[in-house]
């Protein structure tokens, strides 16, 4: 398997020369394995170079890794957290590319703007939310809207 670091095109997976053990940037132990990863000008055990969000092994996932805000990320989590520079779907203000965001389908939100648009309830990790007629709703407001027929009259 050949894994390339997108930034400099240098193979991340290397064969370690005998007798010269490198120190792992992840766990600070000597790398005794035959194979090691080199990324961000540091050496890593294959098990130690992981995405800070999903914990996937970056040597297995694909050819690139991403780093931002002192985080090492896989492509999926980098795009999920930082996306591209654009506007918040709730407040329409600019979202800088370095800022963490929330996503719901194609919409991107500031963390502070990701709340029920009827009652302003903020969501915590794991909370259920609904996207109806391009509005973020908590479960209570979503169910009330269905019961009283509000959403049927707002079909877009």
From Swiss-Prot:
GO process annotations (BP): negative regulation of transcription by RNA polymerase II; positive regulation of transcription by RNA polymerase II; regulation of T cell homeostatic proliferation
Tissues where the protein occurs: Expressed in the brain and not in the thymus.
Protein's job: May be involved in gene regulation within neural lineage cells potentially by direct DNA binding or by binding to other transcription factors.
TM ranges: none
Superkingdom, natural source: Eukaryota
CDD domains for the chain: LIM1_LMO1_LMO3 (cd09388), LIM2_LMO1_LMO3 (cd09389)
A Pfam cross-reference name: LIM
Keyword Ligase listed: no
Molecular functions per Gene Ontology: metal ion binding
Entry keyword set: LIM domain, Metal-binding, Nucleus, Repeat, Zinc
Protein name as catalogued: Rhombotin-1
Subcellular location as annotated: Nucleus
